[in-house]
Amino acid sequence: MAEREVEIVIPPHAPGLQHHFADLEQQREASTMGMWVFLITEVMFFGGMFFAYLVYRRMYYQAWVAGSEAMDFWYGTVNTVILICSSLTMALAVRASQLGRRRALVILLIVTMIFGLGFMTVKGVEYHGHWLKHEFPGPSFHFEGPYEQQVQIFFSLYWAMTGFHTLHVLIGIIIIGFVAYFGWRGDYTPANHNTVENVGLYWHFVDTVWIYLYPLLYLISHSHPFK
């Protein structure tokens, strides 16, 4: 008796589905979990610098006030407004990807990139001003006023925290550029837009870090709760 051949039917491969996932839902859950784990490590990274800042602020409060007075309030405020606006455009971009509105997605991502570049431009002008005044930690550091050594610690943390944050903004701009290209190409659909959501999470995290940096660095001289 001849054996009957069994026909194996392979389900069609969903667009955007990587081979090691069973379906798009499993892929979405895995990538979202991976992004949150990454963001937790970022929280610990910046959290260490925030902790050091608060410890030294408690030890040298008057020096911290003096250092904050050397900050340009308007540069910090303008950059805060820029990043808040960029969070809005990113949120709208995520929504556009969920609705399958490719044109809106690309436009909103490009606008978000422009906001990011605007932030970096303002930050570059601010950095240049500090550099000209020798407010950079090292042998040539100079600060007109008391507590020069302690203020140098303030500026060390200022450059470290804002420098790493600006680096994260730059990385975000580059990633958003790639996502905008893939969105223009039509890679994202209402069923497969998790990449846009994850990039949105990253960008909102970067913006949130700045929301903490802004009062710590620019507003301390205007409010003295720990006197």
Identify the role of each PLM range.
Residues 1-227:
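...captures the hydrophobic TM-helix bundle architecture rather than a specific catalytic motif
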